[in-house]
């Protein structure tokens, strides 16, 4: 290469570097001004998870392995987990058959003596971990069918078996009402108890940007979602502006050096603890809208980063519904602790770790890491699970400190922070889960609240009175004064034979 040509090539390279540097510097100034504006993603469009994958390949891949991704899907060989090869289920006088039609579609046929068979075409699936539910479509309305598939045990079961209600009177005649727009009939009677309309119920928590689209005058629905399932924009907010503006590589590189977060998207890890918890609480804490009609007509206005309390309030034991303060009582123990799942957010709100500390959902759970079953952060399971607490309670990090604090072997279940402070007393999706009301275990308080206590969930051959005596011996009578509430008391073995269904499940 001649000297003159090398000079020109070198000059062009220098100019390119200088030009890029000037462009980045200019973009940094623009970003600096951009960062000063308040984030407001209301009115911003959605682009879908595939658009996010173009830049965020690793995050897309980790999300793809979660059960959030498959929360709702169109029925297809990729999404349907149930046995539709002609499997049958008989319950409450109804015979259900699950098979495929001539076109390969999925269907359920329900037959009851004295009534014609009813055929429901399965068009969508809900869930993919413990059990999978199925939706049929009738015009503009989707209905949850009365039969579900247990993924882990590979069997069909009636939806009445997934909820805690009294069994129907076996001698009562089956009710076979005519189908109406507000209530279809599949098997009829109690078999259909948990048939539910998806458009103004399940849609809110299992999809991105749900909008029931209810017409107030006709009661019909024009339901829409930005994406089926719980995808990127459910947690990060609508991404149209973010995707458009960050298509410019100069802006992307300039953002790396920016002192604050990109205002065109939400990073939950950069939100204040309460706002971060609000994001999860939108679905993991059942709530009621301040004004129900706008929610049904236009959708939930919440976007990640919002204060969840601006448009809705969490349900509590005494939350009234049409003046009835007992409407939600069965979802909680007597003392207001959640009895059923989907109230984890309420548990956090009752926890001193959140009320007086920095605890939030992502302190323990990682949406892009860990086992999809629970999505615990790496390093917070098994023998190292106590780290979820000792990052604040550092004095209890060493085994000797754990043994002194718990009076248990630190390597055994009694040395686990969660065993005592988050006992498994919550029922849902066919399993018993940890309470998210993080508190000091107190047998007397648990007994007065009508719920199982942490001690006897492990010491199943002991009574609550024994647990109270042990607590006073270990930690002092000042903290645990004697209580007449637990005099005598019962054991979990006796609870198995009792009438409280969640207590039976906990004891089992």
Report residues per predicted region.
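Short, Lys/Arg-rich N-terminal segment immediately upstream of the first membrane anchor
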Residues: 1-5
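Hydrophobic membrane-insertion alpha-helices, especially the h-region
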Residues: 10-22
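Membrane-interface motif at the C-terminal end of an N-terminal transmembrane signal
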Residues: 20-32
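Primarily the internal scaffold of c-type cytochrome electron-transfer domains
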Residues: 29, 33-36, 50, 58-127, ...
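Local sequence-structure signature of Cys/Sec-based thiol-disulfide redox active-site neighborhoods
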Residues: 42-57
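Long, basic N-terminal domains or extensions that often function
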Residues: 171, 187, 201-205
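Surface-exposed intrinsically disordered loops and tails
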Residues: 176-182
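Conserved catalytic alpha/beta cores of large enzymes that bind or transform nucleotide phosphates
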Residues: 199-213
